[in-house]
Amino acid sequence: MNITTWGIVGILLMFAAIIGTGFWISNGGKPYNTGIFTLHKLITIAAVVILALMTVKTHRTSGLNTAGLAGVITSGCLLIGTMVTGGMLSVDKVMPSIVLRMHQILPFLTTLSTGITLFIMK
């Protein structure tokens, strides 16, 4: 497959930066620091685009096996859940505590799932 070890390390470092800026945002409290919040979102968008390009390239060159496809779907669903809960937390309304708890857990599950998926696709 076409995913290099450096590609996996790069994506996982981006995920670490996303989680790190997320901690930075949460420790700052509301209203969120616009600069850090924007950085958090931009790193996330970059990671999603790079992951999508890596997945498409792998699929076009050698195809995705069943495990790779299952991993992509699982990671995608976890990533969507992470983004939805993050979006819910960023609005001015008070959200149920389960939303915060999910947003604290989902990024780690997303990182784990994505790392395993990239390793499978390698």
Predicted regions and their residues:
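Membrane-embedded alpha-helical bundles that constitute the cytochrome b-like, heme-associated redox core
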Residues: 1-122
